[in-house]
Amino acid sequence: LEELTHEAWILREQGSGTRLTFDQAMRHHLNSLNVRLELEHTEAIKRAVESGLGIGCISRLALRDAFRRGSLVAVETPELDLVRQFYFIWHKQKYQTNAIREFLDLCRSLTAGVRRSDEIVLPSIA
């Protein structure tokens, strides 16, 4: 972990959920981090890291193809808590259609028991 604090970091912008999770996990090291770039899009972070500008912290699901191609590799950090929760929200007075209920059920079934985003198996669209 100490080695990571000396690297050039490419991160999401302040206020994004990913950045909040990262900042909380690295809270004891924030003063010593070298943040080279703050970008608003995950794809931009991937491209910057692939170009050798630094290291980043984004969802494994977003990186699945880059890992498969071998253009990026994961740095395992079991000592960091990088878990992030997502919630479904909707207007309390809006009617939920069958399609919305089916979509929510599908999302719950795809993520049941999943510990990391790259463990989600997305169905192919024919």
Where are these regions (language model features)?
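Proline- and acidic/polar-enriched loop/turn elements at helix boundaries
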Residues: S16, E38, R60, P78-E79, ...
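A late-sequence structural motif
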Residues: V73-S117, I125
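Hydrophobic hinge/microswitch elements
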Residues: L20-A74
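Acidic, Gly/Pro-rich loop/turn segments at junctions of secondary structure
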Residues: L1-I10, Q14, L61-A62, E79-L82
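Alpha-helical segments flanking ligand/cofactor-binding loops in enzyme cores
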Residues: E2, K46-R47, R101
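Secondary-structure junction motif
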Residues: E7-H29, Q96-N98, L104-D105, G113-L122
